[in-house]
Regions:
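Rossmann-fold dinucleotide-binding core
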Residues: 1-65
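Helical "substrate-binding/catalytic lid" subdomain
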Residues: 57-174
Length: 174
């Protein structure tokens, strides 16, 4: 009676990408999508990625976020390894970048790693706590949605539990 179409379109990219018209959309159900809907998506996205049937766009968004949070956790761990052994953490990121392993988002995140803990206070700490909440929500959803390979749920749970430390946003209890 209402001629309703269902598909999913998840947006990837933050405020900076939105300002320059460089959003990426992850689409589920694109084959069933009316032309007018595809045209609308094309207005605000410079990259449209077909993920599969309805629901796949959301699954892809969560999967991309899992990869991002795993990289943030790895970057934090590697940074700490370098600093606690007296090494230069910038050398780590230079090597990672030169070998093609460092993406833009993780490179931007890495700038947080040199900020001393005592500066994570007030509004700044609240912003980091918000990021912790978002990351833990996404990682919990990934564990609920997927059936990871044997042993991988523990890996995801470890990343989930590490997020307060990754964002240097833990409370006094650490």
């Amino acid at each position: 009676e209402f001629n309703v179409h269902v598909f999913d379109v998840c947006v990837a990219g933050g405020a900076t990408q939105a300002q320059i018209g460089a959003q990426t959309v992850l689409v589920g159900g694109m084959d069933e999508m009316p032309v007018t809907a595809k045209e609308l998506i094309g207005i605000y996205a410079d990259e449209i990625i077909e993920a599969g049937p309805v629901g796949s766009g959301a699954a892809l968004k969560i999967a991309v976020n899992v990869m991002t949070y795993a990289q943030f956790a790895a970057a934090t761990t590697a940074h700490d390894l370098m600093t606690t052994t007296g090494g230069n953490p910038q050398a780590l990121f230079n090597a990672w970048k030169h070998m093609g392993q460092l993406g833009t988002l993780t490179e931007q995140f890495s700038l947080l790693l040199d900020i001393p803990s005592e500066h994570f206070v007030g509004d700044f700490k609240e912003k980091m706590m918000t990021q912790v909440g978002i990351s833990q929500k996404d990682l919990s959803l990934a564990m609920d949605l997927g059936w990871p390979r044997t042993g991988m749920v523990g890996f995801l749970q470890g990343i989930h539990d590490a997020m307060p430390n990754v964002y240097n946003a833990y409370g006094t209890e650490q």
